[in-house]
Amino acid sequence: MNHTSQAFVNAATGGQPPNYERIKEEYEVSELGAPHGSASVRTTVINMPREVSVPDHVVWSLFNTLFMNFCCLGFIAYAYSVKSRDRKMVGDMTGAQAYASTAKCLNISSLVLSILMVIITIVTVVIIALNAPRLQT
């Protein structure tokens, strides 16, 4: 409030503070105050587990299964990813993390070996194509 409105309120009430009616619940709370007697105060502590996100790598495993399934590593990674997702749904975060770690390693292995096989195949085809005219003569 600014200064002029305070003067108006004080003049309207005759200089006395306004008389507020006390709410019943407010009155009862102030009357009760602190607990009386020898009853001990009990506190309850609730431990809320923090939200832990365990990646299950299902999409990556599915991609490797469909497109880069070198020696069935993508399929095995997909199986471990599904196991990881199942463990996460049950609430076993340690088990889910272990399965997810295995799925991640298998996915990396499948990806690297498949890319190496593609590169080796391309290099082999190029070398054969470049040497083909020499072989015909």
From Swiss-Prot:
Family: Belongs to the CD225/Dispanin family.
Linked residues for Glycyl lysine isopeptide (Lys-Gly) (interchain with G-Cter in ubiquitin): 24, 83, 88, 104
Subcellular location: Cell membrane; Late endosome membrane; Early endosome membrane; Lysosome membrane
Superkingdom of the source species: Eukaryota
Lipidation (S-palmitoyl cysteine): 71-72, 105
Role according to the record: IFN-induced antiviral protein which disrupts intracellular cholesterol homeostasis. Inhibits the entry of viruses to the host cell cytoplasm by preventing viral fusion with cholesterol depleted endosomes. May inactivate new enveloped viruses which buds out of the infected cell, by letting them go out with a cholesterol depleted membrane. Active against multiple viruses. Plays a critical role in the structural stability and function of vacuolar ATPase (v-ATPase).
Gene name, Swiss-Prot/TrEMBL: ifitm3
Membrane topology annotation: Single-pass type II membrane protein
PTM section of the record: Polyubiquitinated with both 'Lys-48' and 'Lys-63' linkages. Ubiquitination negatively regulates antiviral activity. Lys-24 is the most prevalent ubiquitination site.
Protein name: Interferon-induced transmembrane protein 3
Chain ranges inside the bilayer that never cross it: 58-78
Sorted UniProt keywords: Antiviral defense, Cell membrane, Cytoplasm, Endosome, Isopeptide bond, Lipoprotein, Lysosome, Membrane, Palmitate, Phosphoprotein, Signal-anchor, Transmembrane, Transmembrane helix, Ubl conjugation
Assembly and binders: Interacts with ATP6V0B. Interacts with CD81. Interacts with SPP1; the interaction reduces OPN expression. Interacts with BRI3.
InterPro entries named among the record's database cross-references: CD225/Dispanin_fam, IFITM_antiviral_protein
Cytoplasmic compartment segments: 1-57, 79-109
